[in-house]
């Protein structure tokens, strides 16, 4: 499992999600607004909006917040957000891809560059690291939907490419273009997914020691703390021994 997924699991176990709930809702709302603005405000006619709402519901975002975010898209004074991707290197030469939705490119670029620099990394040009990642669909389910065999069978039938199952749940990988079709097929067997989204999946991972892992996790944490940053992906790998120490 790539470093960022491991990091998410650590943060979940430490209960950090509760302290960043408001910021998470803000990011989910921004994605809903952008999705509604770039397509139809009806989720039945707009796949991106449908998935944005589904992901928000999976995080227990209140219905009123979701409806307000959709309505905001049609407001005359609603902000125009640009989708921007930043790429760079963290400690140890680890590749990092950052996705943002911003109403001020200069502000966001300056903030992201500063975070990389303070972590001992460097912000690069667009395309400087994304070539070592694949754009794929990621569909996640909670562990209670079934055992690994059941989920694997459903995933193969739906046309997915890979499945990772653990005590934390099931992660299903599929082609980016097939994400909507695969998620609908899985929903018919396993029910509604916890999340469905496009991600940058590393083609290969870089093993890091405990010191580097801590530095990289701090880098990711600081990037995700920025209001404009929506997602962060990286290609580092942490051993089970180090993971256990960081999870303690």
From Swiss-Prot:
This is Probable transcriptional regulatory protein Atu3727. Residues 1-21 are annotated as: Disordered. Signal peptide: none annotated. Keywords: Cytoplasm, DNA-binding, Transcription, Transcription regulation. The keyword Transferase does not apply. GO terms for molecular function: DNA binding. It is found in: Cytoplasm. It comes from the Bacteria. GO terms for cellular component: cytosol. GO terms for biological process: regulation of DNA-templated transcription. It holds the Pfam family Transcrip_reg. Belongs to the TACO1 family. Its main location: cytoplasm.
